[in-house]
C-alpha cells in the first residue's frame, strides 16, 4: 500500500483509495455481512438487553436516535439541571406510542411505557380526551422531573453495562461468555498523569496477566490482555521520548515477558496520532527482543482512520519478515473527535485522521483485503 504523510490531502488519499478498491469485492463483502447479521438475529436466546433495545429502537427512527444520544451523554453530565434539559429535549419530542408492546422482550416493552410516561411527566399533555393514553399524563404529572431523571439514569446505567463485561475480575469470571469466545481484557481509563498513576496501571496489568493466565488454564481458551503504553508513563510524548524511552521500554518488556511465561497474548493498544512514531519504535524494540522474537503472542492495533494507516501496514509487514508472526487488531479508530480538536487547538496544517468517515470504511476494507 502507498505511504502517506501525517497531514496528507484528504482529496489525494480519496482518489488513491477509490482507484485501489476492487468493486468485485463489494458483493462478497455484502454477502458475508448479510450472513453474519442473519445468523445473529436467529440466535434470540443469546441476545443482550442492548440487542433487544436496538431491535426496537434502531437509528432509523427519531426515538432510537434520542435513546442513543441519552446513552452517550447523560451519564457524563455532572449537574442535574443540564441532565433535565437534555432528557426533556430527547424524550418529549419522540413518538413512543408507536413502540408500545412491539418488542419481544418484556423489559423493552416496560421501558417503552416508562419512556412514554417520562415524556408526559416532563411536558404535561394537552387535553387528550379522545386519546386512550390520557390517563398517563394525569397520573404522572405529580411525579416530578427528579424521579424521571433518576429512572432514566438507572436505565442508561443498565444499558451501559452491556459495553463492559465487569468492573473487576471477580465479576468478569461469572460470565458464561468466557467459556465460549476469546476476549482481550483492557483497563478502562486515560493515560497516566502522575508517576503513582503509572505504577498503579502497571500493577493492574501484572494482576490482569496473572488472572487471565489462570482463566486460560481453567477454561482451555486463549484470552489476552491489551496494554496502553501511555498508561505506563506520565510523559509518554515525542518531546520527552529520548529521556523516558528506557523507563517505558523496561515496563513494557517486563509485562510482555510475564505474558510470555504464562502464554497470555498481549495486544499493544493504539494511541493518538502524535504518538504513532514512538509507539512503532517501542513495539519494534519489544518485538525484536531476543526472548520473545520467536513468540507469536505479541500484537498491536491499527487504526484505519489514520492517514498513515497504510504506512503502519507496510511497517508491520517488514517487521514480521524479521520475526515470528504477530496478530493485528484492525479498528476504525478511537479518538476521532479528540484528534480533530487537538489539530485545531495546535493550529496544525491539517488533520492526521480522515475527515470523511466513509473514507475510513474504505481504508479499513482495503487494509482487510
Please annotate each region the language model reported.
Residues 369:
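Calmodulin-binding IQ motif helices
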Residues 1-366:
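Positively charged, amphipathic and often flexible ligand-engagement surfaces
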Amino acid at each position: 500500500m502507498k505511504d502517506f504523510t501525517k497531514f496528507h490531502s484528504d482529496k489525494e488519499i480519496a482518489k488513491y483509495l477509490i482507484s485501489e478498491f476492487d468493486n468485485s469485492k463489494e458483493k462478497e463483502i455484502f454477502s458475508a455481512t448479510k450472513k453474519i447479521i442473519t445468523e445473529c438475529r436467529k440466535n434470540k436466546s443469546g441476545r443482550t438487553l442492548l440487542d433487544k433495545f436496538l431491535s426496537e429502537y434502531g437509528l432509523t427512527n427519531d426515538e432510537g436516535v434520542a435513546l442513543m444520544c441519552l446513552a452517550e451523554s447523560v451519564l457524563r453530565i455532572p449537574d442535574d439541571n443540564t441532565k433535565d434539559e437534555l432528557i426533556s429535549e430527547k424524550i418529549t419530542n419522540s413518538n413512543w406510542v408507536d413502540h408500545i408492546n412491539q418488542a419481544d422482550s418484556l423489559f423493552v416493552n416496560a421501558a417503552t411505557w416508562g419512556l412514554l410516561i417520562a415524556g408526559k411527566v416532563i411536558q404535561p399533555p394537552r387535553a387528550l380526551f379522545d386519546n386512550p393514553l390520557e390517563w398517563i399524563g394525569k397520573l404522572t404529572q405529580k411525579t416530578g422531573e427528579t424521579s424521571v431523571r433518576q429512572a432514566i439514569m438507572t436505565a442508561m446505567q443498565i444499558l451501559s453495562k452491556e459495553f463492559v463485561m465487569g468492573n473487576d475480575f471477580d465479576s468478569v469470571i461469572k460470565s458464561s461468555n468466557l467459556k465460549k469466545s476469546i476476549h482481550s481484557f483492557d483497563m478502562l481509563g486515560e493515560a497516566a498523569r502522575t508517576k503513582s498513576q503509572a505504577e498503579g496501571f502497571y500493577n493492574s496489568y501484572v494482576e490482569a496477566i496473572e488472572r487471565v493466565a489462570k482463566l486460560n488454564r481453567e477454561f482451555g481458551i486463549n484470552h489476552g490482555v491489551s496494554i496502553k503504553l501511555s498508561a505506563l508513563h506520565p510523559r509518554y510524548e515525542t518531546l520527552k521520548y529520548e529521556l523516558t524511552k528506557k523507563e517505558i521500554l523496561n515496563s513494557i518488556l517486563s509485562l510482555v515477558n510475564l505474558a510470555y511465561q504464562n502464554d497470555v497474548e498481549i495486544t499493544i493498544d493504539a494511541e493518538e496520532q502524535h504518538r504513532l512514531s514512538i509507539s512503532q519504535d517501542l513495539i519494534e524494540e519489544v518485538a525484536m527482543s531476543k526472548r520473545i522474537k520467536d513468540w507469536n503472542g505479541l500484537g498491536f492495533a491499527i487504526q484505519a482512520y489514520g492517514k498513515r494507516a497504510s504506512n503502519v501496514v507496510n511497517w508491520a509487514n517488514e517487521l514480521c519478515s524479521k520475526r515470528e508472526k504477530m496478530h493485528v487488531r484492525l479498528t476504525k479508530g478511537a479518538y476521532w473527535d479528540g484528534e480533530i480538536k487537538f489539530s485545531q487547538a495546535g493550529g496544525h496544517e491539517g488533520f492526521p485522521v480522515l475527515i470523511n468517515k466513509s473514507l475510513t470504511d474504505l481504508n479499513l476494507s482495503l487494509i482487510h483485503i
